[in-house]
């Protein structure tokens, strides 16, 4: 039975990473350290900018996060690709939450703009994804717009994030 709460704590996210929320192999989140948020604070099917769904998540930023120690020595900054990956992770989670089956894969995006950085003094990152479209055929495909804020300043904007759920052996390159 699929888990349809409107929010998830860290343990719930780990359960998703272990394949315990949506069934084995279905829309699993990565496990730490690649899990890029600590909780989902809101998920629904009729909210967001387009009225087709919303998912919002948060990351508590601590100076000892794994990426600050290696990116870059003496100039710590969260890699922009990790914030982008968090947005893709959230689209995949939404697809599983709405009943989609298959393994999640990021498929691209239309546009990405960075106007700031996540640095060690930042206390909280908020991710927001507004679902634009979900298609269900041989694969489940989600298209969404998203943003990332650092201490309430929106610093990343992504348009047309694309994530697909693929049945085993049917993913890109298979």
Curated annotation (Swiss-Prot):
Its EC number is 4.2.1.59, 5.3.3.14. The keyword Lipid metabolism applies. Pfam families: FabA. Keywords: Cytoplasm, Fatty acid biosynthesis, Fatty acid metabolism, Isomerase, Lipid biosynthesis, Lipid metabolism, Lyase. Necessary for the introduction of cis unsaturation into fatty acids. Catalyzes the dehydration of (3R)-3-hydroxydecanoyl-ACP to E-(2)-decenoyl-ACP and then its isomerization to Z-(3)-decenoyl-ACP. Can catalyze the dehydratase reaction for beta-hydroxyacyl-ACPs with saturated chain lengths up to 16:0, being most active on intermediate chain length. Homodimer. This is 3-hydroxydecanoyl-[acyl-carrier-protein] dehydratase. It comes from Nitrobacter winogradskyi (strain ATCC 25391 / DSM 10237 / CIP 104748 / NCIMB 11846 / Nb-255). The lineage of its organism: Bacteria, Pseudomonadati, Pseudomonadota, Alphaproteobacteria, Hyphomicrobiales.
